């Protein structure tokens, strides 16, 4: 069952577009970054199409043989679920494992910049998008800011 609505996010500047979407299993999938696209260009049309298993990929779910985290362009990579890229974080989970699976939980749009104490901050932004990811097993959350 697909409990995640395959929503997409589009961030435009005067000259560039950045698109990503929520995959059917809840992962944030990078779709496009480059020259400014027309308003008619949608993430679902530009996203990678998968119909067969790629090489010796690890299946993420028995419900979809072609869905493999290692062959997807992801906004966030996890440990221990078949994505072999370097993860931006490593958590020791409450059960002692290092396995994580962060999926979309919610998002908010904030007016202006969201300052982060002790970190460099952007200035002059019209809006800031915050996406919250939640681990599928443990109540651990990550916020991504765009």
Can you say where each PLM-predicted feature lies in the sequence?
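N-terminal accessory beta-strand-rich subdomains and adjacent acidic, glycine-rich linkers
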Residues: 1-146
């Amino acid at each position: 069952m697909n409990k995640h609505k395959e929503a997409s996010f589009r961030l435009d500047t005067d000259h560039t577009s950045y698109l990503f979407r929520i995959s059917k299993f809840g992962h944030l999938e990078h779709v496009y970054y480059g020259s400014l696209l027309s308003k008619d260009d949608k993430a679902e049309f530009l996203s990678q199409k998968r119909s067969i298993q790629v090489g010796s990929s690890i299946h993420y779910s028995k419900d979809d043989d072609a869905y493999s985290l290692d062959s997807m362009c992801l906004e966030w990579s996890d440990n221990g679920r078949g994505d072999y890229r370097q993860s931006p974080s490593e958590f020791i989970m409450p059960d002692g494992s290092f396995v994580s699976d962060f999926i979309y939980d919610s998002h908010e749009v904030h007016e202006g910049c969201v300052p982060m104490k002790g970190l460099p901050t952007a200035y002059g932004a019209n809006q800031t998008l915050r996406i919250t990811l939640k681990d599928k097993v443990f109540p651990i959350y990550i916020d991504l800011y765009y």
